[in-house]
Regions:
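N-terminal pre-triad scaffold of radical SAM enzymes
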Residues: 48-92, 97-123, 185
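Conserved, mostly hydrophobic/aromatic
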Residues: 27, 53, 83, 122, ...
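Catalytic cores of alpha/beta
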Residues: 169-173, 234-248, 315-326
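Glycine-rich, proline-tolerant flexible connector loops at the mouths of alpha/beta enzymes
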Residues: 36, 71-72, 93, 123-133, ...
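Auxiliary Fe-S-binding modules of radical SAM enzymes
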Residues: 1-44, 107, 113, 251-417
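Conserved SAM/AdoMet-binding glycine-rich loop
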Residues: 117-215, 220-227, 233, 307
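Generic structural signal for well-ordered alpha-helices
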Residues: 109, 136-140, 174-175, 212-215, ...
């Protein structure tokens, strides 16, 4: 829909909403209060929020929809934290705890690289008594075997844990990770950047203050990060827009975020949902809420973060296609392995092949392109091709549910003597 059509429709909606959307189209910064109004939109106003977000997406990045060929390597599910939303982690005494040795991590990275991956994403639980050099050793081992692969590794929670285990500052530890081969950090462990909220859903998790310190320090060292938000649980829409505004302020200061990813809460196996720990906890966000959240993200971040990624693992293929008209422009990664959403009850698999992504993008009239982690365009496609990963059965990569049952990588509890 062209801008003239949007202008015409804006005359027929609530004046407050119309004013906010007009400001967005004028590329003015949208306040927290104004962004909250977008969540109240109904009827034609609801659709106009999506139209405006789509127009801003078109101006910012055009009709190219990107994806990255990558592999997730969640090398252990053993964790000293017990977050209410996490069905992935296991206590070190549980039988389902696993821990991949460095040689297996490297094997998985090499397998992915040989199938065309440009990135490995490395995240895991926080095992007790962790060797302080573990993260560095893993990165060095990967880079020794595959010097050209991009390591997108270690959330702010893991960085803080590594710094504590090493008894050094966050800055010193990040410098060590960079020297060891870390190229970028996932901006996960953010959930909602409100301390009272975090104390409810994940007591003991990294604080807002420490999360910000890790992110800003990484940016100051030339380490880009992503940014994320987990929504659809007990937070309010005001909590969401304040979270996005906080990320916007960080981006103004550092310019280090490459993307923003709204992450819908997967409830089925999440402890705080299964045991009804919090009054009013929701079963994730519904379809309209998901669409609005991606649109609000684009509108609030328009002048600051170019790339809005949807999570096909959480939303599925059809909803992901729809979100490409609600402000999103990135399909994320091929993944090959996915443990965290799957363990919580997601049903959309762990591998989306490059030719599948390209087809999904073409079906909605946009142009697929493979990108690097930092959003450099590697290949644009006007006709399909056949990549190595397109010919692989996803069973080749194993699964989380197999991993927690086999003995080969079972976590060995150091406290058993």
């Amino acid at each position: 829909m062209n801008i003239e059509s949007i202008d015409s429709l804006l005359k027929h909606v609530d004046p407050v909403l119309s004013n906010v959307l007009n400001n967005a189209l004028s590329e003015k910064e949208i306040s927290v209060n104004d962004a909250s109004e977008l969540y109240k939109a109904q009827g034609i106003g609801f659709h106009l929020v999506g139209m405006v977000a789509d127009e801003l997406r078109r101006r910012r990045v055009g009709d190219i929809v990107t994806y990255v060929v990558n592999r997730n390597i969640n090398f252990t599910n053993v964790c000293i934290k017990q977050c209410g939303f996490c069905a992935f982690s296991r206590d070190f005494r549980e039988e389902e705890g696993y821990f991949l040795p460095t040689e297996e991590i490297v094997r998985r990275a090499k397998e992915a690289y040989n199938l065309g991956a440009t990135e490995v994403c490395i995240q895991a639980g926080l095992p007790p008594d962790m060797n302080s050099n573990l993260y560095e050793d893993v990165c060095k081992a990967i880079k020794t075997e595959i010097p050209n692969i991009h390591i997108h590794g270690f959330s702010p929670e893991e960085v803080l844990y590594g710094a504590i285990r090493s008894d050094v500052s966050i800055r010193e530890y990040l410098s060590r990770l960079k020297d060891a081969g870390v190229n970028t950090l996932p901006g996960t462990a953010a959930e909602i950047l409100d301390q009272k909220m975090r104390d409810k859903i994940s007591p003991g998790r990294i604080t807002v203050k420490d999360w910000e310190e890790v992110i800003k320090t990484a940016h100051s060292l030339g380490i880009n990060t992503t940014s994320t938000m987990m929504y659809g649980h007990i937070e309010s829409t005001e909590d969401r827009v304040k979270h996005i505004a906080k990320l916007r302020e960080i981006q103004k200061e550092t310019g280090g975020f490459t993307e923003f990813v709204p992450l819908n809460f997967i409830a089925e196996e999440a402890p705080m949902y299964k045991h009804n720990i919090h009054e009013g906890i929701r079963h994730g966000a519904n379809a309209n809420d998901v669409m609005l959240t991606h649109a609000v993200s684009r509108i609030m971040l328009n002048n600051y973060i170019n790339n809005i990624q949807m999570s096909w693992v959480k939303e599925g293929q059809k909803m992901s296609q729809l979100l490409l008209s609600w402000g999103a422009n990135d399909f994320g990664g091929t993944l090959m392995n996915e443990s965290i959403s799957t363990s919580a009850g997601a049903q959309h698999g762990q591998l989306l092949k490059p030719n599948q992504i390209r087809q999904l993008v073409w079906e909605v009239g946009k142009i697929p392109a493979e990108r690097s982690t930092k959003y450099e365009i590697l290949r644009k496609f006007d006709a399909d091709t056949n990549d190595a990963l397109d010919n692989v059965d996803s069973n080749q990569f194993g699964s989380y549910f197999e991993l927690i049952k086999i003995n080969e990588f079972k976590y060995k509890n150091p406290r058993r003597g």
